[in-house]
């Protein structure tokens, strides 16, 4: 879609990811990373009996949009590192705006935007052990999107 130029008209946020280098994924730009996350998310969908039956438009759109906030939040730190603070929150707002412009259903917009905003929640507990309260908070915040959020997080790892 980006190579053909179609993204400029449908999802103009995607071409902006091509030259954004994420320090956690130095070997690829954010666009390539996004395509890998999308492929992984599709692979994590379940059959009709599972919690995330394929094809799952919600999970796929969340995977596609999960890092769209990075270009707007990129900051060069004094130590030479690059940060994307709050790209999850900014990305969720951008996702909501784009999906509204494309006339998606309000429930789908809410779910995809929530997944984009929550996609880093699990990573906040990587360096510390999870407390019972942290587990309850994660499950509560994910709500009905719990299985999708787990798959999105795993695809983004």
For the regions a language model picked out, list residue spans one by one.
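Long, charged alpha-helical interface segments
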Residues: 2-45
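C-terminal subdomains that position terminal phosphate/3'-OH groups for nucleotidyl transfer/ligation
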Residues: 16-17, 23, 40-157
């Amino acid at each position: 879609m980006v190579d053909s130029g179609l993204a400029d008209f449908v999802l103009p946020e995607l071409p902006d990811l091509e030259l954004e280098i994420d320090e956690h994924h130095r070997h690829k730009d954010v666009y390539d990373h996004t395509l890998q996350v999308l492929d992984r998310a599709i692979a994590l969908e379940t059959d009709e009996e599972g919690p995330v039956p394929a094809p799952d438009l919600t999970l796929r759109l969340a995977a596609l949009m999960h890092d769209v906030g990075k270009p707007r939040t990129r900051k060069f730190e004094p130590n030479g590192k690059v940060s994307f603070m709050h790209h999850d929150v900014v990305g969720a707002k951008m996702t909501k705006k784009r999906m509204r412009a494309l006339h998606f259903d309000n429930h789908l917009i809410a779910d995809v935007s929530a997944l984009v905003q929550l996609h880093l929640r699990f990573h906040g507990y990587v360096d510390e052990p999870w407390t019972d309260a942290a587990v309850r908070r994660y499950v509560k915040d994910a709500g009905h999107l719990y299985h999708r959020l787990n798959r999105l997080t795993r695809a983004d790892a």
